Each structure stands twice: as C-alpha cells, then as structure tokens.
Amino acid sequence: MTSIIQSPPLNSKKPHLSQDDRINKNNNNNNKMIFQKRTIADNQIQSPLIGHYKLNNNNNNNNNNNNNNNNNNNNNNNNSSSNNNINNNNLVVDECCEKTEQIETKETITKVEDNLNLEVDVDKEIENEIAKYQHLLSTSTIFNGICQDYTDESDNSDEENVDDDDEEEDNKKQKEECEEEEEEECEEEEEEDSDEDSDDDDSDDSEDSDYVEESILNNCLRQQQQINHNGFMNKKYNYIDTNSYFFSRQQQQQPQKINHIYADTSLRMELIELLTVMKNNEREKGNMVEDVCVHEIFL
C-alpha cells in the first residue's frame, strides 16, 4: 500500500496534521482541562481545573462586559460631546442672529430718525417760504415797491431829458455846419459847371449825333444774313468790323492807330457810351485820342 502524503496548503502558518493526530490532540486537551495541577512557589495548593476554568471564563466575561460598558460610556461621552458641540454651535448661531437683528434694528431706528429730521427741515423751509410770500404779497410791500419804481423812473426820465436836450443841441450845430459846407460845395460846383457848359457849347457835337440806335439794330440784322468784305469768320465766333461806330468814323478820317474790342451785344452799348465819354474828356484836356473799334461777338 502506498501512503499518500498531503502537502500543506499555501499561505498557512500551522503545519498540516493528519486525522489521527487531531484526535489525539483533542483528547490531551480535554484531559488537561479536567485535571491540572498548579504549583506555587510559596504554598503548594492543588486546585481542580474545572473551578479554575470557570473562574477564568467568568473573569473573561466580566472583562468583556467591562469593555463593553467602557465602550458604551465612551460612545455616550462622544455623543454628549457632539451634543455639546451642536449646542455650542447653536448658541453661536443664535448669538450671531441676535447681533444682526440688533444692528438692523439700530439702522432702521437711525433711518427713521433721519427721515423725521428731514421732514422737520422741509416743514421749516416751507414755513419760511410761505412767510416770504406773505410778506411780498402784503399791500404795504406792494405799495412801497410801486413808489420806489415810480421814483426811480422819474429820476431816470429827468436824466434822460437832460441828455436828450444836450444831444439835440449838438445835432443842431452839426446840421448847421453840414448845411453851410454843402452850400459852399454847391456854389463851387455851379461855377465849374458854368465854365464847362461854355466850353461844350463851343465844341462840336458831331460825335454824339452820329450815334444812332436804329443803325445798330440794322447792322445786327445784317450780321445774321451776310458777312461783308471787312469781316472774317472763325470756327466759334463771327467777328464783324463794319458794325462798329468808331470803325465807320475812322474809315473817313484815316486814323493813325486803331484799337479793336470784341464784346457781346449786351455789353457793346455800355462800352460805346463809356468810350465816348472818355474820348470827350481827353479832347477837353487837349490830349490826342486813339480810336477804338467795338465789335460784336456772336456765341
């Protein structure tokens, strides 16, 4: 017969015992628990194991009970401490709430007092304004104000009257002086005009008599129909020399120099008048006058 040796299991600290070994061990333990001799150095006392085992069990039970009681006491202490902490926290919260309530009540009281003070100030201002208006609306103040205005206006009117009188006198003097100066100037101008009239009567009026508007109109009509041999054409403008008053006179007198001016129909008449006046003034002074031809331009 081959015997099978069982290997001990892994991770086991105790050695593996066979079934017979286990039975023997249990029997030995039981015998030891029934009768056990205990020797003591001083006095040898033999005591049965049963009583000692019971005492040990009781002691163990008592110790366990004491431990449980201690644990219960500790738990109770912990609970009481937690309750105390909770109570303390509640007390702190209550104190904070009371403080905030006190602060809020103080603020509301101060606001109410400020509002009351403002209302009192406003009432005082209203009373003062009412008193002022009553004083202004009283008949005595109105009468006094009207009297003062009347006296001020009368004083101002007197001063203005004095100033107006002075200004009128100054204006009269200035007018008289101006009239005298104008009379002197008029006399001088009359004398000069009389001398000029005498000179003009001696001079010939042939130049003014030669200017006729009808001839100018006829010439304008001719310009639209034909161009004479003295004129010339341009791409943009049509210049005609025969339509000029001064040009026609110079053809008769054989001038030394001729000045040509080109103008629109609306400006041509004004230019001719100005040039005639200028030429007459130059002739009166004894100066030589150059002839000018004013030509019409057609756009």
Swiss-Prot record:
Annotated region (Disordered), positions in chain: 1-30, 54-89, 148-212
Which residues fall in a compositionally biased region of kind Acidic residues?
150-169, 177-212
Q: Bias regions of kind Polar residues — which residues?
A: 1-10
Q: Where is the composition biased (Low complexity)?
A: 56-89
Q: Name one GO molecular function term.
A: histone acetyltransferase activity
Q: What is this protein called?
A: Uncharacterized protein DDB_G0284311
What organism does the record attribute this protein to? Dictyostelium discoideum
